Amino acid sequence: MSISKNLNLPLALELAKTNLQAKYAGSIFGFLWSILNPLILFLTYLFAFKIILRIPWTHQDIGAFCLVIFFWHWLAQSLTESTSLVLGNKHLLSKVPVKLETLAIAAVLSNFAQFFIANILCILVISVTLGLTFNPILYFLAISLTLLLVIHFYTVLGSLNVFFRDIQHLVVNFLTPIFLLTPAIYDLKDIPKEALPIVWLNPLTSFVTIFKAAFKEIELHYLILSVSLAIGWIALMFLLHKVIQAKMLKQLLDAL
């Protein structure tokens, strides 16, 4: 109860609703646009790997890959939008006593709602057409951990971008390298041992691996390592958020 009151969750929900309404205002297709982008990306990769390169993917592989692409799209969209959290809401932060965490939760819920609805629809369609099976425990574990990470992405990157505007450009330019260093279109077992440390240094590798494990069998030691690293990355982002809150909050508000 105290956490809900402290973060003003009712306000966060209202802001998330407003964000969604504003995003699709005047759009004929509305919510369908949130499905179209990752779907086009999935079909492009499917054509390249399955048809041109003739990689022997099973129906389960194809279904898992489709859902991982949707998961990645959610992460990429959150990363891109996180840098504008403070600058895009400076009118609220400078005039209304609203916590940065409340704005972050609102933004996260807005993106998550689109991802989750689209993802559930895809799971249902793929399960019927391709016979996809999945582990709901790992699925919701991946989503829960990712939600915690993304909230701190918003508060940390959004705050730092006020002082260092290059961050927003760095995030956009590094999205493709980060994607290619994430085991989304390939499996961890296919990576040469000398290249594995580089892949594990990617913060998103562990989260994508846990999500992928919900739809595709992954070696147990990779799964345990992924969960451990995911918790570690969340803890690191939480500490960075606390440092910013303690050391830079006044300067942050003065800079708006």
Functional labels for PLM-detected ranges:
Residues 1-256:
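Hydrophobic transmembrane alpha-helices and immediately adjacent juxtamembrane helices
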